[in-house]
Structures are given as structure tokens and as C-alpha cells.
Swiss-Prot record:
CC cofactor note: Binds 2 manganese ions per subunit.
GO MF terms, alphabetically ordered: aminopeptidase activity; metal ion binding; metallopeptidase activity
Annotated Mn(2+) 1 binding sites: D342, E491, E532
Organism per entry: Verticillium alfalfae (strain VaMs.102 / ATCC MYA-4576 / FGSC 10136)
Gene: PEPP
Similarity remark: Belongs to the peptidase M24B family.
Required cofactor names: Mn(2+)
Name of this protein: Probable Xaa-Pro aminopeptidase PEPP
Residue positions binding Mn(2+) 2: D331, D342, E532
BP GO terms, sorted: proteolysis
Catalysed transformations (reactions): Release of any N-terminal amino acid, including proline, that is linked to proline, even from a dipeptide or tripeptide
């Protein structure tokens, strides 16, 4: 660290296991004129704790039951409503979405998180040393990107080392040691100038103790070449990842609140969508609604894709007009105190508030896929069996619509349905939108993932492999079973991405024979449909944390028939 840099940390003592969490703020750059503020701001400012509900604890997982046969799709595409609708109502928030984040006083459960990591490390003593992320300025500038820390080290802001009147003038007061102790369940907080002495003392008092680092670059001069301690850079990352798979009651409360805010913002978009002319308006309203409710940070960049853009899984331009298009896919969620939500709704476009016939067919199919999968969530279930269930429902629905043709078993064996359902059913959610899975994979033991993508890519070959794995039965090595305390998304979708379908599937005889091009051409303008909720696995089933309306409830709001 350069002279004058300010570094803060919090120390957590849990019996004989010490977890040391360091938050770093560095003012850098050749021409920076901003005083080193050392605010040690966490990844999302204003970290706080919420009142806890009943704890949701991880319990022994029963043996996986045989994969149930996906239910047959016994209802055809529903009729499309027509007729005049009343004008859109004024945007007066109703009680159901009048959600505003309030500052709480209960403590962040730092000791519990440290204890979970210690348990995964199988360690009764040791030191976890976690440097935080530095804040930086652009080269030759006094400005820089918004500060965001590694999700694994997000924490409350500890006290500054050198608070001066000038720093207060520029940046305001930072939390005192007393403030930090009041905000977090920790036993001791010190100023950063005490860190070298603390580490030297620890090494002398705990001869041959293990110091756990995420990687060697995160060490400290007081630890380098210190013969009194053993440095372990291999065990901490998998232990922390596994500890994050099941959430504490405090974490669940934060995810629930993030979903409440996001659901209210989605509802606001529904009330306005008939008056909007561009994707920009949709994205702007969503983020504004989150901000005024106290959750200004988005868990990921909002996706507001209309028409063909709805077929791009991670569309981000959000800059095209809505006129003449069938649907808008709005995939957007805020975060609260670093915990994410991830919510997707598909809205009809146009003045009537009704889906076009083709869009309604696809929406109803995706709705059936999601409802069946959510209803099946329970402890002990292999999550990837839900993906197969959704794929089977999609196959039968696309056969019924005539987009697919031929023998159902032959189409399934070829994996052709992946042309239209090309991504995984969902993912963990928590400190990150696409949260860590721990030692096992939620969906694929080894699969392609786009950089920074939220979804596993599922090719036809991967789908066939998943089905074969279920058919051969246990052991399910590397496949993750659902456990109480997990929060996962369930987000099936059907897409008509012309480049993808024609670039891969229509070029191969084994797929081309099962796709009716004439019928497919009628559905290309739909673009795509996705519906996504965040689902908490409970001891006896599940809780849907996402309250954004969908289906007929959504359509009534869009048409101004309900709030």
C-alpha cells in the first residue's frame, strides 16, 4: 500500500476461529486530486440488517426420487381476448406495491457467516484474511468507476484510519468504531494502522496456525515469509462458495425485500406500458421505481427487449421503438444490501393490452412450463430434472402448435427442442445474480457459460446428455439436489432467434426434419417469451419470493382493469 492510503477492516472472533475481513479503499491515479477518503464503502452502500424470520436451516437431504414423468400438456392454446379496454389509469401506487426500504437496526450476522465458512473448512482454529477491493480512479483523472467489491467480501464499513476535517468536508463522516460494532455482529474493530501489529501478534500467539487466503495476491507483508504461520490458498474459495449455497434467515430477508422492490417496479411498468414508445422508457421507469423505493443499485443491467430483441438472451441496448412489435421481455431486478433479485416478465405491446394470437400461444406455453416446475420444487429434488420437465412440456407444446413435427420420442432423442429453449432453467441467487453453486453444479456438471452470462447454455447434445443421466439413475456425481435455504430462479423461455435456429438447427438433417419452416415463419416476429421468479426451497416445499403479477393478473393491470 502506498503511503497515505487508507485501509479498513473488521475482525470477527468466533470461539477459536478468527475471521478477518478487510475492506480497502485506495485513491489512485497520477493526477488524482481527491483526498484519500478511505470511506471503505461496501459493494452496495448502506449495508444494514433486517428483522429475522424463522431460520431456514440446511437439513439432511433424502435420496433422490425417480424423475417424475413430465405432465402431458392437456390444454391447447387459449383464445386471445379482443375488444376495447378502458384507458390506462393514473399511476397511483396501490398498497400491494407501496414498498420502500427502511433503515433497520438489527445487526448484520457476521459471526454466523464466519462460522459457516469455518464449518466448510473443517477448521477449529485459524485466520481467514480477506482484503477488500480497492477503489480506483481512471488514468490521469480524479474520477473513477462506482466502487463495487468482491461479493465474497462485501461487509459493513469499518472505521477510517485518519479522519480529518478536510476529508469530512469532501466526503462526510465515516462510521466510527462504535457505529461499526453497532451495525455488525462482531467482537472487535480496530483502525487500520493496527493491522501489521495485529498480524505479527497473531503469528506469535498461534504458532503454526493456518492463514486462509483466496489467492496468494491477497497476502500481507506481515504474513509473507512468516515461518510461524502456514498460508493456505486452496481451501478458502470452495469453502466460501459452499457456505453461500444455502442462505441464512437474514440473507433470505434481504432477497425477499429485493424481490418486493423489483416486483413493485415491474408492476409500475405494466401500468405504463401502453403509453410507452421505446425500450428506453421501460428501462428508465424500472430503475427509477427501484431508486425511489430505496434500492438504487441494479443487480444487473436491465434487459428491455422488444420484438426480435426478445430473442437475445442478454440484450442490453434498450434503445429501439416498441411500435409494431408483439411483446417486450423485461428482465430486471434490484439488489438490497448486496443481495440480488432476478425477475422477468413478458408483456404484450400495442394499445389493447392483449397478446397477438402467436404471442399468446407462446406465452401460455411458457407459463405452463414455469408453473409445473415451480410446483415441483422440494428438498431432495435434482434441479436439473426440472429442466427436463420444462423441456418436455415445451416439446409437446411446440408439437401442438405445429412448429415441431414428427415423432415425439424421436424429437426428444435428437434434442431439437433446445433450438427454442436454449438455456438452463435457472441458477442460484444471492450475493450475485448468478450466485455460486458450491462443489456441485446446479444444472450441468460441465457446460458452456458465456462470460458474465446469467444462464448456462444448453445445446441439443447437452439436453440429450441430461436425459441420459436421469435414465441411467444414481449416483448423480456433481449434480446438485435442492436443500432448504437455497434460493434459485425458475425461468423457462421459448425463443425464435433466427440466427441461432437457422445457423445450427436448420443446417443439420437430424433437426431440420422436425421443424416446420412455414409455421416457424409465423412465430419469428414474436421474438421470445420468458417468465422468471426467485424460489426459496423450504423444509416442506418452496416459497415464491417474487410477487410481480403475471398471466391474467398482469394483463388486467396492463389494460387498466386493476392496479
Amino acid at each position: 500500500m502506498a503511503s497515505g492510503d487508507n485501509v479498513d477492516y473488521e475482525a470477527v472472533m468466533v470461539d477459536e476461529f478468527d475471521a478477518l475481513n478487510i475492506e480497502v479503499r485506495v485513491s489512485a491515479g497520477p493526477s488524482s486530486s481527491v483526498p484519500g477518503a478511505a470511506l471503505s464503502a461496501p459493494r452496495c452502500p448502506g449495508m444494514r440488517a433486517l428483522p429475522l424470520k424463522a431460520p431456514v436451516m440446511s437439513t439432511p437431504v433424502p435420496a433422490a426420487a425417480p424423475l417424475p414423468t413430465p405432465p402431458a400438456v392437456d390444454d391447447g392454446p387459449s383464445a386471445v381476448g379482443v375488444g376495447n379496454v378502458p384507458p390506462a389509469v393514473d399511476d397511483v401506487p396501490s398498497a400491494v406495491d407501496d414498498v420502500v426500504i427502511q433503515k433497520e437496526t438489527t445487526k448484520y450476522s457476521a459471526k454466523l457467516h464466519a462460522a459457516k465458512v469455518a464449518d466448510e473448512l473443517k477448521a477449529s482454529a485459524g485466520l481467514v484474511f480477506l482484503p477488500g477491493e480497492p477503489s480506483r480512479t481512471y488514468e490521469y483523472s480524479d474520477m473513477g468507476p462506482a466502487f463495487s467489491s468482491n461479493a465474497a467480501t462485501s461487509s459493513t464499513s469499518p472505521a477510517s484510519t485518519s479522519l480529518t476535517p478536510r476529508k469530512v468536508l469532501y466526503n462526510g463522516r465515516v462510521p466510527s468504531i462504535k457505529d461499526v460494532l453497532a451495525a455488525s455482529d462482531v467482537d472487535e474493530v480496530r483502525h487500520m494502522q493496527d493491522l501489521p501489529a495485529f498480524l505479527h501478534a497473531y503469528a506469535h500467539q498461534h504458532d503454526k496456525a493456518t492463514v486462509y487466503l483466496l489467492d496468494a495476491s491477497q497476502s500481507h507483508p506481515a504474513l509473507v515469509d512468516n515461518a510461524r504461520v502456514h498460508i493456505d490458498t486452496a481451501a478458502l474459495r470452495p469453502a466460501m462458495d459452499e457456505a453461500r449455497v444455502t442462505k441464512t434467515a437474514h440473507e433470505i430477508a434481504l432477497i425477499r425485500e429485493a424481490n418486493a422492490v423489483s416486483s413493485a417496479a415491474h408492476r409500475a411498468v405494466m401500468r405504463h406500458i401502453r403509453r410507452f414508445a421505446s425500450e428506453r422508457q421501460v428501462a428508465a421507469l424500472f430503475t427509477a421505481e427501484c431508486t425511489v423505493r430505496g434500492a438504487p443499485t441494479q443487480a444487473y443491467a436491465p434487459i428491455a427487449g422488444s420484438g426480435p430483441n426478445a430473442a437475445t438472451l442478454h440484450y442490453g441496448a434498450n434503445d429501439e421503438p416498441l411500435a409494431g412489435r408483439h411483446v417486450l421481455v423485461l428482465d430486471a431486478g434490484c439488489e438490497v444490501n448486496c443481495y440480488a433479485s432476478d425477475v422477468t416478465r413478458t408483456l404484450p405491446l400495442g394499445p389493447t393490452g392483449h397478446f397477438t394470437p402467436e404471442a399468446r400461444h407462446i406465452y401460455d406455453l411458457v407459463e405452463r412450463m414455469q408453473e409445473a416446475c415451480v410446483a415441483a420444487v422440494a428438498p431432495g429434488l435434482l434441479y436439473y430434472s426440472l429442466h427436463l420437465k420444462a423441456s418436455a412440456i415445451a416439446l409437446r407444446g411446440l408439437l401442438r402448435l405445429g412448429i415441431l413435427k414428427g415423432d415425439e420420442k424421436a424429437i426428444w432423442a435428437a434434442g431439437t427442442v433446445a433450438a427454442f429453449f436454449p438455456h438452463g432453467l435457472g441458477h442460484h441467487i444471492g450475493l450475485e445474480t448468478h450466485d455460486v453453486t458450491g462443489r456441485d453444479r446446479l444444472l450441468l456438471a460441465a457446460g458452456e457459460r458465456e462470460p458474465r452470462a446469467k444462464r448456462d447454455a444448453v445445446s441439443a447434445e447437452m439436453l440429450v446428455g441430461l436425459a441420459a443421466a436421469v435414465a441411467t439413475g444414481p449416483p448423480y456425481r456433481g449434480k446438485q439436489m435442492l436443500r432448504p435455504g437455497m434460493v434459485v430462479t425458475v425461468e423457462p423461455g421459448i425463443y425464435f432467434n433466427k440466427d441461432y435456429i437457422e445457423g445450427y438447427f436448420l443446417r443439420e438433417d437430424k433437426h431440420r426434419a422436425f421443424i416446420d419452416r412455414d409455421v416457424l415463419a409465423r412465430y419469428y416476429p414474436v421474438g421470445g417469451v420468458r417468465i422468471e421468479d426467485c424460489i426459496l426451497v423450504t423444509d416442506d416445499g418452496y416459497e415464491n419470493l417474487t410477487k410481480a403479477p403475471k398471466g391474467e393478473d398482469m394483463l388486467r393491470i396492463i389494460r387498466g382493469e386493476a392496479q
